[in-house]
């Protein structure tokens, strides 16, 4: 056992003697024989308040006894454990930027589809002014041209003029053949 030199005297003391001064609750060798045979812990403090507090004050500061309370970071710790458990189970609910963009794109598409499919009377009024069907169709075509069917005017515009001239001639030939 290592010996320590005391500041008060020039005599050296053993480690056990120093611990006995610091913690007066250590059993004496004479008491050890009696206490070995019986269970002596009563789950109470081994020394009353005030006794041994002078020796303890010299070595370290004792925290005041408080009722149990969760630590300040216990909620953070529990949240991290729950997060790890979800990750292990594969129930990771963390939303990534890719997931956000995908969800927003899907919501945008659904809104446009709903807008283009619905034919409500409120759509035909813009700021209290009557708006005809062609204006609404023009607006829809401008927003999403691939979603709106073309009308007869647009079909006539797309057909080249020479094929339109051939159609009446083709109709006349079967009529002449019947005569």
UniProtKB/Swiss-Prot annotation:
Keyword Membrane annotated: yes
Location of the protein in the cell: Membrane, Coated pit
Compositional bias annotation for Basic and acidic residues: 164-179
Keywords: Cilium biogenesis/degradation, Coated pit, Coiled coil, Membrane
GO cellular component terms attached to this protein's record: clathrin-coated pit
Subunit structure of this chain's protein: Interacts with AP2S1; the interaction is direct and mediates association with adaptor protein complex 2 (AP-2).
Name under which the protein is recorded: Coiled-coil domain-containing protein 32
Main location: membrane
Function in brief: Regulates clathrin-mediated endocytsois of cargos such as transferrin probably through the association and modulation of adaptor protein complex 2 (AP-2). Has a role in ciliogenesis. Required for proper cephalic and left/right axis development.
Parts forming coiled coils: 75-98
Swiss-Prot/TrEMBL GO biological process terms: cilium organization; head development; regulation of clathrin-dependent endocytosis
InterPro entries in UniProt: CCDC32 (IPR028039)
Membrane topology (UniProt): Peripheral membrane protein
Region (Disordered): 157-179
